[in-house]
Design a protein with these regions (language model features):
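Conserved ATP-binding N-box helix of the HATPase_c
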Residues: 2-38, 117-122
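Generic detector of short, locally flexible boundary/turn motifs and exposed helical patches
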Residues: 1, 85-87, 94-97, 176-182
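Generic recognition of well-structured, leucine-rich alpha-helical segments
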Residues: 15-18, 73, 124, 221
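GHKL-type ATPase core
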Residues: 27, 33-52, 109-223
Length: 223
């Protein structure tokens, strides 16, 4: 199956699954291709900034946004200490569980997390994926944002290997937990979320909306 077909199928299936607990007549999934300024985005990535600036010196690059609405969004615990062993929840399963069993196959055909599953988001670009979601929490709403990088640990061109030679191919950007420095939590501050989304020219979810936006930077439109 062509990679783009797999991406569309996986995205719609994920949104369909996330719509089952929402009282609505339908759910929406929108695919949007746009451009962004690499320097502005790379500046958000700490020690990866210089490496990305070197690889992508152009003033513009392409991204893909997959956004669903009338779905539950990335619900569930955000701390390891709160996980249910039987069900990690939408947030943990998509952000942290995907890609943890890597294989030597660069085509994603060798099973594990690089098979025909959610790792398709990472394969659509260079391995960077920005997750943004708004969920219902009791009588209010909460926004969550986190960035993930997943690469093949055997890939000699890995970005992370330019920082740590024995990298296992996984990294995340979010906010540190004040209670436990070992925990990485999603960004929940509205102004910080808006600032990052502005890089891509996309907006936050409106009050009362629930759903998830997956932004994949540095895509190749010709693939």
């Amino acid at each position: 199956m062509p990679e783009i077909d797999l991406l569309v199928r996986e995205a719609i299936q994920n949104s369909s699954d996330a719509s089952l607990k929402v009282d609505a007549d339908r759910f929406d999934v929108n695919f949007t291709i746009g451009t962004f300024n690499p320097l502005k985005f790379n500046a958000e990535l700490g020690c990866l900034k210089a490496i990305l600036d070197k690889h992508y010196p152009e003033e513009s690059a392409d991204y893909l946004e997959i956004r669903d609405m009338r779905t539950t969004g990335l619900t569930g615990p955000v701390r390891l200490s709160e996980l249910d062993r039987e069900d990690h929840g939408n947030y943990f399963k998509l952000v942290f569980d995907t890609g943890k069993e890597q294989t030597a196959s660069s085509s994603g055909e060798a099973g594990g997390s690089w098979g025909y599953g959610k790792s398709v988001y990472y394969r659509a670009g260079i391995g960077l994926v920005l997750f943004y979601s708004q969920i219902a929490v009791d009588d209010s709403f909460e926004e969550r944002m986190i960035l993930s990088l997943t690469e093949h640990e055997t890939d000699s061109s890995s970005l992370l290997k330019e920082i740590v030679s024995d990298s296992v191919g996984r990294a995340w950007w979010g906010r540190r937990d004040d209670k436990n420095p070992k925990e990485l939590l999603p960004i929940t501050d509205a102004s910080e979320i808006e600032s990052i989304l502005n890089i891509f020219g996309v907006g936050r979810f409106k009050q009362g909306q629930t759903g998830t936006a997956i932004i994949i930077p540095y895509i190749n439109r010709d693939r």
